[in-house]
Amino acid sequence: MAEYKDTLNLPNTSFPMKASLSVREPEMLADWQAKGIYQKIRKARVGSKRFILHDGPPYANGHLHCGHALNKILKDIIIKSKTFSGFDAPFVPGWDCHGLPIELNVEKKVGKAGSKISPREFRAKCREYAASQIDIQRDEFQRLGVLGDWYNPYVTMDYHYEANIVRALGLMIKNGHLQQGFKPVHWCIDCGSALAEAEVDYEDKTSPSIDVAFSAVNPSEFLNCFETQPAVKPLILPIWTTTPWTLPANEAVCLHPEIDYALIDAGNSYYIVATDLVESVMARYGISHYKTSGSAKGRVFEHFKLQHPFYKRQVPVVLAEHVTTESGTGCVHTAPAHGPDDYLVGQSYQLPLINPVMANGCFAENVELFAGISVLKANETILAVLSERNVLLASESIRHSYPHCWRHKSPMIFLATPQWFISMDKSNLRQAIINEIDKVNWVPDWGKARISNMVENRPDWCISRQRSWGTPMPLFVHKTTRELHPDTLELIERVAVMIEKSGIDAWFDLDSSELLGDDAKHYDKITDTMDVWLDSGISHYSVLKHNNDLDFPADVYFEGSDQHRGWFNSSLTTAVAMYGVAPYKTVLTHGYTVDAEGKKLSKSKGNYVALDKLVNQHGADILRLWVASTDYRHEVSISEEIIKRNADAYRRIRNTARFLLANLFDFNPASDCIEAKELLELDRWALKRCQLLQEEIITAYENYHFHLIYQKIHNFCAVDMGSFYLDLIKDRQYTTAKDSIARRSCQTAMYHMVKAFTIWLAPILSFTAEEIWQTIPGNNSESIFIEHWYDAWPIIDAVNMEDWEQLHIVRDEVNKALEETRQRGEIGSALAAEVTVYADAKALPKLTRLGEELRFLFITSEAKACPISQSPKGLAVTDCGVSIQVTASAHEKCARCWHRREDVGQNQEHPELCLRCVGNISGYHEERLYI
């Protein structure tokens, strides 16, 4: 064989089998940056239709995790696929830079603002810290192969962006959406600030569950509402609560106007309880002997007076729709300072809005019985007071979902404080937002219901914060009337110009007289900062409307499912409040990253997968393949085992590319491509299969179904290529003459296929696709990412794809029969066999048409097809209607092609070869038509 090896066209390529991604990827990334590939992509698409995917800004704090990678890689896949589709698809990344997490990190180093360091110096340190985090995250995002305008990002702490936040506030004021109020808001005691809905996490917490007696001041007026005219004795409306610390702020007991309430005679006293809850309430109180003495609707008790359980004041019975009979008593403790429903009821009944709790979470000094006690520790004291006064009817502990600060993970409270709000209803904003939601394409479609529900039920948006590091609310309010200055809109623009020049310190350093002159003595300067969700939420204004390379509205916003209450919501609210339209056409949502069992990733649980470790060990392309392989619309599982499975799939893809490249080692597309009419039928089939598959892949990219692309490409490599086409062409590629039509035919097909295949891969396996691209013969563009979807296909005459599908099926059955024969020890390789296929009338013509080339379909030394009627008795018929007979060949093995042929040894000059091989090495070009 040694003397004939040099006569074979054996594959040869510089494209390595071992990927070594952790080494090659950084080198390629450096090359992209040195060549300015992103800028060249933009230049290549100048004048094309734009596609804008607007990046939701990650928070500039800490290293990236797998959730960041999932999000940015998905976006990158979209941007690159749209670029291949001919769009001008710029990607401008962003960062969210103000807010508490950065403050906390800076506090650890320099102390709190105003104590060890001045607020101005503190803000400078925050800015410095955020900038350092952006540098870290920028490098980590780029390492993932994400292309974008990384050195011209939008950054919410940039002076021009801060100025635009202020201008956005001005627009919302102009449109009548801002109002100030003393309202209950989510308050984090550790933060010392109000928080938005998006900054609240719900976690399980153990709380006291108590029932408290509110006694009727005048039992008769209650009893007179019942037709039974019961005898007069003490009467109690019991309330149930899990927040005893709010009882000092109680101003009413709330009933539902249309719920039926039962009058329960328990002997010494009456109870009024929702009829549906009587049994559970009496059981809780340990009262077994009682009777129902009447029933009445809740509305009949309106305005009747009750005695506060431990203060001298009397409180009214009020009515509201939020009362239910799901739990409790049907009588709801109402503290307007400590809950949004309570507040609304208080407003409608003009109840006192008295807040006994200070910003530090302690009761004020004038609060009787509980002065100075932290509300988080007050429950025990309050229960003791209730017991002393014999008004504690029941007490136990309950495990329930409770709001916690997203940053501190500590329980939050509702606290009435002076704040600024975007009113959801004042200028019909809520309905306008709901109308816009209907115009947006939500993917998955459940996103529409989710955000609609949030908008319908959300309270007014508290946008003010009592923090140092944030964009200021540049407002002046009258010292007496508390009204905004009449020139507020003009003043806001003047401040915006100042901030654009000097940053937010321009406001904090400002002396009011500089803007107001003599008016300054009548106005207070507001020192609150704005909610960071407003910062990122107005990116549609500061970025999409102010960057000439972008458009408004964006084609796509794409973030995790938590952003329905976060960035999707704040962006929608601000855009509608500012100019009446949604900022996006389509909203895509992906799930959270979880472990293989669907559990949240956590360092403490030991299931955390470190992103940097994955990238350094496996390479970014393996991570990108993991992203593409999952249906991101659900939770996305990741683990070392899952990544290893993706690495295995990657190797199959890489090996397919390597095989194609290795067989093009002597191919010059400019001179060696043959005309379409000369292509062998198998090669025409392969090219047609690729064209059809490309259409499916492009459609999947357009529909953002990346997991389908992964499946299609993997199947293409494993089935269409690995077990069929590439297997069949080896004999022709290796043994026929170098410049023969037969060989150049499959090389022509492989050339077109590898170019198309590489572009299919590029949005997902970006580094590997570029590596393949640089190895493909011919004059190729500087980078694959400047290309379009492949369209230089040969014009192919009709190929009967169904016939080839049938041939593929029969081949699979023959392979099974060969394997069974091999297992019995009758043959070694398939080339040691001769096969007879007995086929039905449908399959037979497809097989006999191939003639002598049928053996190349099965890769056996001999093959023939006969009518199934000639099948030997006892030979099984397969599901595809054929019977297969395998026998060991009795002929000698050709030393060059390894086929066992009758004519081996008939040529005296080459006695070890079959006559086909003799011809191929002697200048005779073997003719093939099909395979």
UniProtKB/Swiss-Prot annotation:
Task: Name the InterPro entries for this protein.
Answer: aa-tRNA-synth_I_CS (IPR001412), aa-tRNA-synth_Ia (IPR002300), Anticodon_Ile_BEm (IPR033708), Ile-tRNA-ligase (IPR002301), Ile-tRNA-ligase_type1 (IPR023585), Ile-tRNA_ligase (IPR050081), M/V/L/I-tRNA-synth_anticd-bd (IPR013155), Rossmann-like_a/b/a_fold (IPR014729)
Question: Which Pfam families does this one have?
Answer: Anticodon_1, tRNA-synt_1, zf-FPG_IleRS
Q: Give the residue interval(s) assigned to the motif 'KMSKS' region.
A: 600-604
Which coenzyme or cofactor does it need? Zn(2+)
Residue positions binding ATP: 603
Q: Which GO terms describe its cellular component?
A: cytosol
Tell me which residues bind L-isoleucyl-5'-AMP.
559
Q: Where does Zn(2+) bind?
A: 894, 897, 914, 917
Q: Which GO terms describe its biological process?
A: isoleucyl-tRNA aminoacylation
- Name the PROSITE patterns on file: AA_TRNA_LIGASE_I
- Where does the protein principally reside? cytoplasm
User: Among its keywords, does the record have Protein biosynthesis?
Assistant: yes
As its record notes, the protein acts as a catalyst of: tRNA(Ile) + L-isoleucine + ATP = L-isoleucyl-tRNA(Ile) + AMP + diphosphate
Q: Where in the cell is it found?
A: Cytoplasm
Keyword annotations: Aminoacyl-tRNA synthetase, ATP-binding, Cytoplasm, Ligase, Metal-binding, Nucleotide-binding, Protein biosynthesis, Zinc
Motif 'HIGH' region, chain ranges: 58-68
Cofactor: how bound: Binds 1 zinc ion per subunit.
Q: What does this protein do?
A: Catalyzes the attachment of isoleucine to tRNA(Ile). As IleRS can inadvertently accommodate and process structurally similar amino acids such as valine, to avoid such errors it has two additional distinct tRNA(Ile)-dependent editing activities. One activity is designated as 'pretransfer' editing and involves the hydrolysis of activated Val-AMP. The other activity is designated 'posttransfer' editing and involves deacylation of mischarged Val-tRNA(Ile).
Give the record's subunit note: Monomer.
Task: Read off the domain note.
Answer: IleRS has two distinct active sites: one for aminoacylation and one for editing. The misactivated valine is translocated from the active site to the editing site, which sterically excludes the correctly activated isoleucine. The single editing site contains two valyl binding pockets, one specific for each substrate (Val-AMP or Val-tRNA(Ile)).
Q: Which family does it belong to?
A: Belongs to the class-I aminoacyl-tRNA synthetase family. IleS type 1 subfamily.
Write down what this protein is called.
Isoleucine--tRNA ligase
What species was this sequence derived from? Legionella pneumophila (strain Paris)
Q: What is the lineage of its organism?
A: Bacteria, Pseudomonadati, Pseudomonadota, Gammaproteobacteria, Legionellales
